[in-house]
Every structure is written in structure tokens, then in C-alpha cells.
Amino acid sequence: MKLGIVIFPSKMIQDKANGLRKRYDPHYALVPPHITLKTPFETQDEQLESIVNKLHTIASKTNPFTLHVGKVGSFAPVNNVIYFKVEKTPELTFLNEEMHSGFFTQEREYAFVPHLTIGQGLSDAEHADVLGRLRMKDFYYEQPIDRFHLLYQLENGTWTVHETFRLGKGNN
């Protein structure tokens, strides 16, 4: 079973991201706009209960926080991904670190850069053109975050929520 752990932004932020993703992201139909806390990983069905229990513990140790989304960035030249930058807060860093240590030990492919993907799989020329146009626009959004989600991948490649974890003591 393939799992991932994400934060979903507000509908307003998702709508703004989806307006761009429809044109620039081939994964648009597979998963809503999100901030990845832990990249997709394979696990056995019998481990799911332990994973859920650990995520409840992590959520209870994390206070709700404000998500700040603004500006457009890119991972080029490593890959042609365009994204909305998400300010790295202590809470986001804590969540990411907890999901890559102890029970969740897994090699990281990249350093943690919180973001909302709005384009990927673009040619070099298309990437440069889209990035240039989007960098001239002003984007800034903020919202309270009080939960994260464990997703699993269906056979058709789409992702769906398995469980939601509310942040803060007494919420799980």
C-alpha cells in the first residue's frame, strides 16, 4: 500500500493553485493541491494501525499554526517544478522531522522545502516562460492550519484520505 502525508490548504488557495495546475501539472486530477509533509512511501497493510497511532501522537505534540503562502518558486535546474512558496514555520519543520525519524525512518531524496506544486513535467522552454510570467504576479495567502492527512493511493493512481489528524493536545 502506498501512503503519503499532507496538509490541504483552504478551498480558496486550492482554487487558485488548481487554476494553474489544470494547465501546467499532469498530476492535476490525481490529488488536490497540498503541502507534502512526507513523500509517498510503501508499507504493508498490517503496519497501518501503528502508522496511524504514531501520527496521532505527532499531531497531539504539534500546535495549530498559520500557513503563509506567497511568491512563486522553482526547483530548476534539479527539476522543472513550479510552486507557490510556503513559509517554513517551526510547526511545519517539526512535523516533517517527526515524519522522517524513528518509526518513519526513510532516506530523504531532497531537503524539506514546503511548497504547493502548480506546474511540473514542463519542457525547459515552457518552464522558463511560465515561471517568468508567474513571478511577475503577486500571490499571498494565509490561513490557520489545525490538521494534516494520511492519504493512500488507489489503483487508478488517484489519492484519497485515509484519516485526518487534528493538531494540539486533546484533539485526537
Swiss-Prot record:
InterPro entries linked to this entry: 2H_phosphoesterase_YjcG-like, Cyclic_Pdiesterase, YjcG
Enzyme Commission number(s): 3.1.-.-
Motif HXTX 1: where in chain: 34-37
Keyword Hydrolase tagged: yes
Superkingdom classification of source: Bacteria
Pfam families in the cross-refs: 2_5_RNA_ligase2 (PF13563)
Keywords, ordered alphabetically: Hydrolase
GO terms of molecular function: hydrolase activity, acting on ester bonds
Catalytic residue list: 34 (proton donor), 115 (proton acceptor)
Annotated motif HXTX 2, positions: 115-118
PANTHER family assigned: PHOSPHOESTERASE SAOUHSC_00951-RELATED, PHOSPHOESTERASE YJCG-RELATED
Assigned protein family: Belongs to the 2H phosphoesterase superfamily. YjcG family.
Listed NCBIfam families: PRK13679.1
HAMAP family: 2H_phosphoesterase_YjcG
Protein name as it appears in the record: Putative phosphoesterase BA_1241/GBAA_1241/BAS1148
Species of the source: Bacillus anthracis
Lineage, highest ranks first: Bacteria, Bacillati, Bacillota, Bacilli, Bacillales
